[in-house]
Amino acid sequence: MPFKTATELGLTQPQYCALVKTLVALEKGRLWQDFDIRFNMEHWGGECGTTCCIGGSAEALGALPHGSLADAASQLSRYGFRYDLQNLFYPYHCKDAWDATQKQAAVALRHYLTTGKENWNMAMETPQ
């Protein structure tokens, strides 16, 4: 199934490209080896980009300003978009998602890019 467009997701092209680049790195399990980024859903990441969640990794890989994707997720929910991007970045509704592996995060991100909807519960059923 093809990805939704940046416009359909309410993202800028750089934000969209950063998420797609992050998906590729997560699916390959190569954040650390290729980009010097450790994955951890509990930590957005600093400007140094050493330990990051999905959003922080995307900002680092896409050379986006620190916190810009978190701001975008918050703004999207205010402008009629669902809370899906915000819930992808901050999965408070699925406590296990805070311990997601790169593989599980990739499933969650791929689902979001394909459907525009967040589904951490489904992603967490993916074997580690």
What kind of feature is each model-predicted range?
Residues P2-Q128:
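Catalytic phosphate/metal-binding cores of nucleic-acid and nucleotide-processing enzymes, i.e., regions
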